[in-house]
């Protein structure tokens, strides 16, 4: 397995992309790049600076002054904003409910995509997001589009919130996830959509292990060519 390929995993909010991507990256000894965490970090920085997240010009001032770095922690990936560990604070509901608004801005996405492509240029990466297979890594050797029902995704996020000690309301989460789907799918710039050459994977009734096995099977097929 000397060949270092790029693996793109796309899908809607709470489809399990990050969880699966981390495991796949670990199995292959690849770098995992969580593009969602990059947008979350920008969102967190903007909220901290009391910036109007609907205002692209103000947001770009934030983006210009933000350095985002990833480091591998013991069991997780750590995210740093200008040297400060923000791994936990970028996962709060306040950030989660606003990240799609920040991500819809053309100039913000262009800059983030540029940074993501830079991180992935040597291959050996697993990258997850909304537009990886269509826009960020259109030449990725493996493209997966993960799906799951709104109900299933809300339940996963609810459990995640409870485990982290956040207040969580299942019905409210269903509404918020449906709203994020709408925002992500309908935005003008790089909307959430399946790449023509991506393999669709419905994870509604599958465990993480089963999803990982399916993806590793696809990767093995690429290595065998």
UniProtKB/Swiss-Prot annotation:
Instruction: Assign the protein's first listed, main location to one coarse class.
Output: cytoplasm
Q: What class of enzyme is it?
A: transferase
Pfam families, alphabetically? Answer: Cytidylate_kin
Q: List ligand-binding residues for ATP.
A: 11-19
InterPro entries in the record: Cytidylate_kin, Cytidylate_kinase_dom, P-loop_NTPase
Q: Name one GO biological process term.
A: nucleobase-containing small molecule interconversion
Query: Could you cite one Gene Ontology molecular function of this protein?
Result: ATP binding
Q: Does the keyword Nucleotide-binding apply?
A: yes
Keyword ATP-binding in the entry? The reply is yes
EC number(s) given by UniProt: 2.7.4.25
**Keywords on record:** ATP-binding, Cytoplasm, Kinase, Nucleotide-binding, Transferase
Compartments where found: Cytoplasm
Q: Which reaction does it catalyse?
A: CMP + ATP = CDP + ADP; dCMP + ATP = dCDP + ADP
**A single GO CC term, please?**
cytosol
Fetch the PANTHER family from UniProt: CYTIDYLATE KINASE, CYTIDYLATE KINASE/PANTOATE-BETA-ALANINE LIGASE
Which NCBIfam families does its entry note?
cmk
What family is it from?
Belongs to the cytidylate kinase family. Type 1 subfamily.
Q: What is this protein called?
A: Cytidylate kinase
- Organism of derivation: Bacillus thuringiensis (strain Al Hakam)
Q: Give the lineage.
A: Bacteria, Bacillati, Bacillota, Bacilli, Bacillales
Originating gene: cmk
